[in-house]
Structure formats: C-alpha cells, structure tokens
From Swiss-Prot:
Transmembrane segments: none annotated. Keywords: Cytoplasm, Elongation factor, GTP-binding, Nucleotide-binding, Protein biosynthesis. GO terms for cellular component: cytoplasm. Catalyzes the GTP-dependent ribosomal translocation step during translation elongation. During this step, the ribosome changes from the pre-translocational (PRE) to the post-translocational (POST) state as the newly formed A-site-bound peptidyl-tRNA and P-site-bound deacylated tRNA move to the P and E sites, respectively. Catalyzes the coordinated movement of the two tRNA molecules, the mRNA and conformational changes in the ribosome. Residues 8-288 form the tr-type G domain. This is Elongation factor G. Pfam families: EFG_C, EFG_III, EFG_IV, GTP_EFTU, GTP_EFTU_D2.
Length: 707
C-alpha cells in the first residue's frame, strides 16, 4: 500500500517550449523553491544548473535534457517531482522526443510576447503523439508587449487546443505583480523582498472583479462540457460548485486530454512558479494514473503483453538516453514501468537478447549523481556498468521478456566531412564519434567508400557545430571541416518490369538465380521503406529464397543508381522466376535482387530528392521586400505573410536546405540584425533537372540518367 501511495505522489514531468520561452529559467526557479539550490542560476550569466554542458552555458541554450528530482509540499503532502528540462531548438528535437516518451505529463511554456512559435507547435504535436497531458504556462508576463489572453487565443486557433485559464494576470509588462486565482477567487501577489519565495493572498483588486468573474464563468463552462455532474450544477446554480469539485474536474479533464489548464507568471522576476508547482501536483498524472503499459512479445510481435504499474510485477524499464559522464563513464537514463531495479542486478535487454549488469544506480540532479540502492516502479533514474544498451531498448526480467514500443527518430538532413589534424587525433576521433553517435540517434557517422572521408550528419548546422565543439572539449580532438553537404535521396518515377538472371560457373558447384519482378514507386498510403509483394505461384521460386530476394532489395535501397544516395521508399513485386536444384542458394537470390534493383532503377526515370525546410522569418515591415527577394533567389516559395502583435511581419516559406547555408548571417545583413528566423524540416521534394545535373556532376554521379 505504501508503494502505491508513494506512486500517487510522484510526478514525471517535462518542461517543453520554443527556444527562449524561458524553460530553463523556470526549471531553475523550481529548483530554488523546492530547496535543491540555494542560489538562483541565471541562463544569461551561464550559471544555470540544468544547462550543465559548457556549450549550453556559452550559448545560453539547452542542448541535452537534464533530469532532476525535486520535492514539493502541497496540501501538507510531500510530492516527488522528476523534472526533465528539454531543448527548444529544432536541431535538438530528438531530446524532446526521447523525454516525452517516458513522461506522464508536461508543462508547455509559452512566451507572453511571442505566443505560439514554430517550435512550440512541433513539441505540442510530439506530446499529442505520445498522449502526454499538458498544462500551459505563459511566461515573461513582465516583458513589453506581454498579453496572456492573446496567447490563450493562439493555443485555441493555431494548436487546436482547449485552453482553460485558471488564473488571469494582475497587470502586465512592468506593472505585472501577481495573478487572480479563478478557483479560489483570490488575488496572489508576490513580494520582491523575498525573491518571490512568499506571496500574499488578498482580495481581488476592485478594477479586476468583473473580468475575473467573466473568466471564472468561462472556466466553469469549459469544465461543464467535460463533466456531466458539474454540468447539472452549472445550469442549476453555478455558485454551489465547490473549490474541490473544480479541482477534481480540472484534473479529470487534463488527464483525459480534453483541456489544458492555463497559468501565467514571470519566472525571471520570481512570480508564479509556486502556483505552477501546485498545479503540477493537482492536475498532472502520477504513474499510478497510467495503470498498465503495453508491449509485445519478443518472439511474436503480434502478441500484446501488459504490465501493471506495480512493484510486484516483473521488471520492465525503457532506456531513453545514453550519456557520457566525465566521472562515471557511460550513463543510461531509464524509466521503470513495473517491478523495481536494485543496484548490482542483471537485466535482460530485449533487443540484443543479452543480460546486462547495472552495477550502480543514481538519481540525477542535472549532471551530479546521488547514489541509490534501488530505482522503484514509476521512477526515473540512471545506471552505469552496462556494455551494450542503446536509446529505446527495453530492459526486463529474462523469464518475462517484453518489448516496449521504441522511438522514431528523423533522418539527418545535413552532413559535413571531418578529418583529424594529426595522426594522434585520428584514433581519438573514432572513439569520440562512436560515443557521440551512441548518445544521439539523429547523429550519424559514415565513411565515404570512394574518398575515404568521414562524413558526420545531423539535424542542422547548430547540431553539427555542437558535435565538433564536443569533440574538441571532451575528446581533445582537433579536426578540419569540409563545407556542409545536403543529405540527398533518390526516387524513381516509372514502373519497370524485368527479368534478371544471375549465373556463375567456376568449376564445381555454381550460382544460379532467376527473378521476374516489377519495380515501381511505393503506394501513397504505404508508410515503411520497402513494400514487398510475393506473387510467385507453384513454387517456381522456393519459399526459403523469397526472404533473400527481399533482403537484396533492402540492401540495394541504401545506394541509388544516380550517385549512391538512399531511396526512401520502393515497391517490388516478385512475379515469377526459376531456380536450380543444386546451384541456387540464398546468396544467389540476394545478389540477383541487387542486380535487378540496379537495372530496373536505371530504366525507371530516377530522380534526385532534396530536403525542403519550413522557414518562418520575423522582420520589420521596411525590410520585408529584401527578405522576400532574397528567398526568391534561394528557390523559396513564400506561402503566407502575417502581422505580429508587435508590428513586425511574419513571412512563412518553404525553401530547399541546399540554399540555406549561412542564411542567419545573410538575414542579419539585409535587415541590419533586426530579423529572426526559425527553420524546421518539412519534406523531401524533386530537385529541378538543371540543379540535379550540377549536384550529380560534383558527386561524380550518373548525369546521363537525368531526363
């Protein structure tokens, strides 16, 4: 019973938002008010506890997700809050994706001036994907142009959310001093002498009473839509609804993802953080609120297995991040869903089918470790001593294996060639890159077979800058960089049917395979890579050779016919063929499939595909013509223009990534430093033939195949 009670008072939450909405500052205030730090660290001073990497402190941005455990007293009850501070920059979305996979709830922070920005949209969609209940926190209410109600409107219109304000601000910009709590109908006013540690509960200022009553009525109306009992009371007599009933309805609506309670504050000015912590305890779910976790049987992926959130169930945990720590070596962060994990115990890795020993366990405070004897059910911790655990691995009990749904990570869109400056750097480079690739699934390392160059790929220029920086600082590797390269892909346009025969006679047993197949673009609704259809009748190709044909095409897709770029999707239908009772084997059919792929793609009108980015530029009105002119030169397509509340113009466009290198510097020049831009990956699109020919000439590819 005690364990269940402990679970009830545990919260696994993340703070997510657009870059610069104040996530890390909010986290720092939470650490201060929960007593974990005795001094507030400021992001702009490079002293934030959660931003522990040197690059984060220098750049004032969050790159990795720092995990911290804090405690908060609410309603005479001690709550344990596992807090994950995630990055807002688009190049680090993998960190957000990893965190949301293992969180029970999230605080979505918004800037009171900027409102719903591109990356806030991205993280909101990621939270929807993992069914993570959210409360909204409108930060920076002290800034010039702050408008809480406008942000609430944007949540409804841009994100399609159902925001439910449970506070309204008292004042705004420099006059912001507190909030009206619409549940208790009291004013909460912070005093600056105590660094915001205390606030006074007062009567609502006379000039705000009417507005507060109007917003309270809107809150009750929203709640009545989600709760039948409350609806009856609301229509009979709203004044009979008690505070406890409102809190219960808010919690119920949040957990069902029907509403998003909205709060406001100014973390930097120390106002509104305690009420945010109270709201986390009141409205966000505990591990006990998600009673079961679903996985599949490793030996039969169609068989669903459930685990109850209970310490008495067999162990089931998910590794969501691997990090290299200078003192303890490789750390694995994991969330325990059922059972418990004691230090020194063996766990079974469902992916590698091997046992791993976790020698020591820690609860993390940013990058400092507090040793633990056991990580219990519903908790988040970190372990060391393992050999082969990767992001997304399921750790379980060997006698009760289970595989939890892993995470999907986007493919990198940009690459650069790196080479060590000295022979001494060469050995270190390999080790450093391997460790960094292990930590970050969106970072890839490849060796170009023709040139022998090492090419590293990632989600954007900033992502690769940080990687190069970490190689220098953590692994003491100095390296030269080539210019950025776009991660092109290939595709085919036309269906091609052909017969491919592979024969080899070298004395003794030979090789033989014969395939008749149709190769074409995948169906529009197909989501995987290779859409493979077996239509062979009458055993003309024995069943045991069909997987080898499939494997051959899968291997072949990694290197297209134009310049060796991968194909994202392909449909292959094996229609017929023949085999030799002695000479045919699995390898023969695999090689035959590789050749069939090459010959078919050459005839199928292959095309080059390039990544297209979604760009949003906020610029003063007078620079707008220059910004649009520059985008047109970069093959951009302007999709819309809006006015922001601050009088600036917002230009939305789709632009090929190949044209966007160094864009930030160019934008600064044409707008005298007054414009800002955000860029996220949108989709892949066909490269115009004249440009495709230039790209293929540089890559020493098959220009002759471009029509």
């Amino acid at each position: 019973m005690a364990i269940d009670k402990e679970l009830q008072f545990t919260r696994n939450i993340g703070i997510m938002a657009h870059i610069d909405a104040g996530k890390t500052t909010t986290s720092e205030r939470i650490l201060f008010y929960t007593g974990l730090t005795h001094k507030i660290g400021e992001v702009h001073d490079g002293a934030a506890t959660m931003d522990w990497m040197e690059q984060e402190q220098e750049r004032g941005i969050t790159i990795t997700s720092a995990a911290t455990t804090a405690f908060w007293n609410y309603n005479n009850q001690k709550y344990k809050i596992n807090l994950i501070d995630t990055p807002g920059h688009v190049d680090f979305t993998v960190e957000v994706e990893r965190s949301l996979r293992i969180l029970d709830g999230a605080v979505a922070a918004f800037c009171a001036v900027g409102g719903v920005e591109p990356q806030s949209e991205t993280v909101w969609r990621q939270a929807e994907k993992y069914n993570v209940p959210r409360i909204g926190y409108v930060n920076k209410m002290d800034r010039s142009g702050a408008n809480f109600f406008e942000v609430v409107r944007q949540l409804r219109e841009v994100l399609g959310a159902n925001p439910c304000p449970i506070q309204i601000p008292i004042g705004a910009e420099e006059t912001f001093k507190g909030v009206v709590d619409l549940v208790s109908m009291k004013a909460l006013v912070w005093n600056d002498e105590t660094m915001g540690a205390k606030y006074d509960v007062e009567d609502i200022p006379a000039e705000l009473v009417g507005e507060a009553e109007e917003w309270r009525d809107k809150m009750l109306e929203t709640l009545a839509d989600c709760d039948d009992t409350l609806m009856e009371k609301y229509f009979d007599d709203p004044s009979t609804i008690t505070e406890d009933e409102i809190i219960a309805a808010l919690r119920k609506g949040t957990l069902a993802m029907q509403i998003n309670p909205m709060l406001c504050g100014s973390s930097f000015k120390n106002k509104g953080v305690q009420t945010l912590l109270d709201a986390v305890c009141k409205f966000l779910p505990s591990p006990a609120d998600t009673p079961t976790v679903e996985g599949t049987d490793p030996s039969d992926s169609s068989k669903v297995i459930e685990r109850k959130t209970s310490p008495n169930e067999p162990l089931c945990a998910l590794a969501f991040k691997i990090a290299t720590d200078p003192y303890v070596g490789r750390l694995c962060f994991f969330r325990v869903y059922s059972g418990e994990l004691p230090a020194g115990s063996y766990v079974y890795n469902a992916r590698s089918e091997k046992k791993e020993r976790i020698s020591r366990l820690f609860q993390m405070h940013s990058n400092k470790q507090n040793p633990k004897e056991v990580i219990g059910c519903g908790d988040i911790g970190a372990g060391v001593g393992f050999k082969d655990i990767r992001t997304g691995d399921t750790l379980c009990d060997e006698s009760h294996p289970i595989v939890l749904e892993s995470m999907d990570f986007p493919d990198p869109v940009i690459g650069i060639a790196v080479e060590p400056k000295t022979q001494k750097d060469l050995d270190r480079l390999g080790v450093g890159l391997a460790k960094l690739a292990e930590e970050d699934p969106t970072f890839r390392v490849q060796t170009n077979e023709d040139s022998g160059q090492t090419v590293i790929s990632g989600m954007g220029e900033l992502h690769l800058d940080i990687i190069i920086d970490r190689l220098r600082r953590e692994f003491k590797v100095e390296c030269n960089q080539g210019r950025p390269q776009v991660s092109y892909k290939e595709a085919i346009n036309d269906p091609v049917e052909l017969r491919e025969v592979y024969k080899k006679q070298t004395g003794g047993r030979g090789k033989f395979a014969d395939i008749i197949c149709r190769v074409e673009p995948a169906d529009a609704d197909f989501e995987g890579e290779l859409q493979f259809v077996d239509e062979v009748k009458g055993g003309n190709i024995p069943k045991e050779f069909i997987p080898s044909i499939q494997k051959g095409f899968q291997r072949a897709m990694k290197n297209g016919v134009l310049a060796g770029y991968p194909l994202d999707q392909l449909k292959v239908t094996v229609i017929d063929g023949s085999f030799h009772p002695v000479d045919s084997d699995q390898l023969s059919f695999e090689i035959c499939a590789l050749q069939a792929f090459k010959n078919a793609c050459e005839k199928a009108h292959p095309t080059l595909m390039e990544p297209i980015m979604k760009l949003e530029v906020v610029t003063p009105e007078e620079s707008m013509g220059d910004v649009i002119g520059d985008l047109n030169k970069r093959r951009g397509q302007v999709e819309g223009m809006e006015s922001s509340r601050t009088g600036a113009r917002i230009v939305k466009a789709k632009v090929p990534l190949a044209e966007m290198f160094g864009y930030v510097t160019a934008l600064r020049t044409i707008t005298s430093g007054r414009a800002t831009s955000t860029m996220t990956f949108s989709h892949y699109s066909e490269v115009p033939s004249t440009i495709a020919k230039q790209v293929l000439t540089e890559a020493q590819g098959r220009v002759d195949l471009i029509k």
